[in-house]
Amino acid sequence: MTKPVADQSLQSLDARSRDIFRLIVESYLQRGEPVGSRNLSRLLPTQLSPATIRNVMSDLEHLGLIYAPHVSAGRLPTQQGLRFFVDAFMEVGDLSEEERRVIEAQIKASGRGQSLDHMLTEASQMLSGLSRGAGLVLAAKTEAPLKHIEFIQLEPRKALAILVSQNGDVENRVIELPAGVTASQLVEASNFLNAHIRGRTLAEAKSEMARLKEETREALDSLSQSLVEQGLAIWAGAESDTPARIIIRGRANLLENVTAQADLELLRHLFDDLETKEALIQLLGLAEEGPGVRIFIGSENKLFSLSGSSLIVAPYRDQDSRVIGALGIIGPTRLNYARIVPMVDYTAQLVGRLLR
């Protein structure tokens, strides 16, 4: 997990201040409620009077780590305080073998014989269910290796060209046929293409067919040769014309504890923003900036500043270690960070392995 360096004045807090601050944050993460000096005095490992605790809380408030939501209330951590807690106190453990087994079984089952979109949707749904937040998967445009191409005649002068990738994606295009093309020539053209494009990306397949132009002339008649050339040409620009897409599951989880209309509006804006192209680019950029899991709390990220949400995100990579997408959890700032970080990290690694 990538961690920024906390402010020196915060790092120099004495042990008593750290204990009180840690208990305030842990109480907030568990119950979402302010905690006062009397409750803290019962929770602290050393005996301190409520008056002493109030003095320490005043110092912590002055540092911007905690605040009082009401005049007579206890204290809650600020976003800066949560960041300090994550950087200085949080201990991220490993997932148990059982947790790893459950995640791996669910992801592998969703990918078996299914499309890439299906597997990523299931990953988003699973993260949502395990975290009680909203699961998010960003699928960037990738060039998956091709599996096969097929031509199906629709009319005497029209055919459906079907391009299937090894990740299960299927693309269809209608092409115009030269006059006189027979069904056997359609099969001959597709067989020739499949012999040379399997396992290559679309760009690589086009380069390979250009290199084999002379061999194509010798192996095929003119009509079949025309089909071979047209069969790949119709996907000109397809390497870059499919946009990245975002998959969000578990939106209802974010609404469970929301009662104020203003908070509902903030969440609505968040989901609207997440559907924009700019958000996709920004999220992928965030994932690419660090080697592992990244945590963004509230206003640390412009996309989530209005809703006061947190984002825990990790990239997943292809066989060449290029970032091809990201996945994570969006939720309230009182997420269980220590539990979710290893969950997101392991899921990202697993998805990356299955896509290779």
Curated annotation (Swiss-Prot):
InterPro entries for the chain: GAF-like_dom_sf (IPR029016), HrcA (IPR002571), HrcA_C (IPR021153), WH-like_DNA-bd_sf (IPR036388), WH_DNA-bd_sf (IPR036390), WHTH_transcript_rep_HrcA_IDD (IPR023120)
GO MF entry, a single one: DNA binding
Pfam families hit by this protein: HrcA
Sorted UniProt keywords: Repressor, Stress response, Transcription, Transcription regulation
GO biological process, one term: negative regulation of DNA-templated transcription
Coiled-coil annotated residue ranges, if any: none
Function of the protein: Negative regulator of class I heat shock genes (grpE-dnaK-dnaJ and groELS operons). Prevents heat-shock induction of these operons.
PANTHER family tied to this protein: HEAT-INDUCIBLE TRANSCRIPTION REPRESSOR HRCA
Family the UniProt entry places it in: Belongs to the HrcA family.
Protein name: Heat-inducible transcription repressor HrcA
Organism of derivation: Chelativorans sp. (strain BNC1)
Encoding gene (name): hrcA
